[in-house]
Amino acid sequence: MYENKQERKPTLKIGNATFITSAATEKQFITPDKPVIAVCGKSNVGKSSFINMLANQKKLAKTSSAPGRTRLVNYFDFGAFILADLPGYGFAQVSKTEKAKWAKTLDAFFRDKEKITHVFMLADCRHDPTVDDVQMIEYLHFHVIPFTVVLTKGDKLSKMKLKEHKRAIANDLYLTENNLLATSSETGYGKDDVLLRIEELLQRANEEIGD
């Protein structure tokens, strides 16, 4: 739908990505043997569709029209890295007890930040960042956890509108546009940009191991 300005094509190939396990508590978190990239975002932002797009699969991560379905940390093996799908936040129709439980799980996951290579924080490109989005970014900044904001559902806006909204969101969140990627799981738009970012992250992680 849109022209991709990124001329360089990713060399990273996602083969047969597979589900590893789900974790409901900190004790169930896995001990990774490769870089971990986490995916977080507001409920119903399109995390499952984003993961399936990267994996070239339709049903690796279960999608649902009902927000709040991801209540566990779901781990997937993507070959060169492990992807951790985190519980969605900001779902209004969940009890305070359940929200507190999710928050505790997220906090426990991020507390062990040495095991986290990067975080992709997803946000709907059609809407302004929510209070929950801002709080998540502030949390990542405070704990010095590297992240990239990934805008989802890019096919829902025209090329011009997407460009304008991307710039506005970057300003609202005090981010450089380089730290903001736009995607569409429907069309595959932006997928190469995400894979290129992952390549850079993995290369950096391997260099740090070498040092």
State each model region's role:
Residues 36, 56-57, 99-102, 136-140, ...:
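Glycine-rich, phosphate-binding/catalytic loops in enzymes
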Residues 24, 69, 81, 88-90, ...:
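Conserved nucleotide-binding/hydrolysis micro-motifs of P-loop NTPases
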Residues 2-93, 208-210:
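Conserved G1/Walker A P-loop phosphate-binding module
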Residues 50, 119-120, 194:
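Hydrophobic packing within well-folded, soluble alpha/beta domains
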Residues 54-58, 110, 173, 198:
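Hydrophobic aliphatic residues
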Residues 29, 65-74, 87-117, 125-139:
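Switch II of P-loop NTPase G domains
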Residues 14-26, 156-211:
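Canonical P-loop GTPase G-domain recognition
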Residues 107-178:
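Conserved C-terminal guanine-recognition region of P-loop GTPase G domains, centered on the G4
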